[in-house]
Amino acid sequence: MCIRDSLLTGEDIDHSDRRENFQNTIFRLLELGALPIINENDTVATAEIKVGDNDTLGAVVACTVKADLLVLLSDIQGLYTADPRKDPGARLIPVVEEITADIEALAGGAGSGLGTGGMATKLRAARMVTGQGCDMIITNGDQPQLLYDIVEGKQVGTRFLGRRA
């Protein structure tokens, strides 16, 4: 599997010609069997054109290209019943069918040290994409093998099920 980083800003989403360009790039990467990794281009993103976090940016891109699946990487395996770094009894939640108030309450516990978002932004991203029928997985970015497992259809991390019309 080939992985390609795609650096975007808010302007790439807001302007139709730039949006079409990044959509075509993502579709071509997928045709070539590459896995697009979406990150905000912090070197050129100003406050006016900044999305703010990669979780939200990934969700916006997934909705724009009508993706079947969005994978968000974290420094933990997924969504837990409690913060796994503080509570040894915390259990991984393998599947979330609906983002309820109880699920949202779990987001306060385990933020990611890898970026600006934490679990709260990951749940907002999940709400955004699942509402468009796209599944989303949160898993550990420190374990690259997990991406292969996802491609092979194995249960990895926490999967949020998209609502199908």
Stretches with model-predicted labels:
Residues 4-165:
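C-terminal catalytic "cap/lid" subdomain
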